[in-house]
Amino acid sequence: VGGDSAAPSEKANPSPKPTPLWDRSPGSVAAVGDSITRGFDACDVLSDCPEASWATGASPEVDSLAVRLLGRTGAARRSWNYAVTGARMADLPGQMAQAVRRKPQLVTVMVGANDACRRTPSAMTPVSAFRADFEDSLRSLRKALPKAQVFVASVPNLKRLWSEGRSSPMGKQVWKLGICPSMLGDADALDSAATLRRDTVQKRVEDYNKVLKEVCAEDKRCRYDGGAVYDYRFSTAQLSRWDYFHPSVNGQARLAEIAYRTVTAKKPLT
């Protein structure tokens, strides 16, 4: 320091707190994903019920993430659901392209179950392709909306859903229509081949969740649920009474709670 330098002021103004990267009260929400976000089988058999969606639904019984963040009127005006029943990770870039047109402040992502729910385990989406499409989706979002936030839900524990749902004779009949055959096919079979098949699917779900966590962690405006959806112990009350696999209205409300907790937390969940 040179001799002519001014002495530091004793009452230096405190530097303003930096604006946090994560806004815990975003002003608009766009949802992308699959049948869970469409409320499939929550209200009627083999039908979407977007009003019961955990992300953007208007149902008072669900109290969706959008309603919790924006209020009922705000959610009706500033939340959009671009999820599609049957969607896989390969469909996410296209859904994201639709969502960015709305310029949402928060995008919710719940996808991956259909990548594991194939006719056979060998038909499941490879982990490398799953990662590439997720990275592509976040990259395109970031390019269009640099400050948009992302909530990423983990893929549910499909093996637990099999374990819970197989106690229902009606549920098992609906499963035969082709709901997640890689996990739910031959639901009562407990031989070594069936056990290996289910364990293979379960391992793939865990690998998908690892990808979701890792890719999200690379983006400062992305929050993963810390595995909360995967860890949630769905009971029959939280499962559709038609297929005992998709969330019921009660189950959708639990998903909304998990999402709201993650989005409004002071620090990201790990």
Place the predicted regions along the sequence by residue:
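Flexible, glycine-rich phosphate/dinucleotide-binding loops
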Residues: 38, 88, 159
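C-terminal or late-domain output modules
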Residues: 45-49, 242-270
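Polybasic, low-complexity, intrinsically disordered segments
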Residues: 1-26, 139, 143, 147, ...
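Cytoplasmic membrane-interface segments at the C-terminal ends of transmembrane helices
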Residues: 72, 235, 266-269
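Short, function-defining helix-loop hinge/capping sites that tune catalysis or transport
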Residues: 42, 118-120, 256-257
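Conserved SGNH/GDSL esterase-like catalytic core that processes O-acyl groups on lipids
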Residues: 46-132
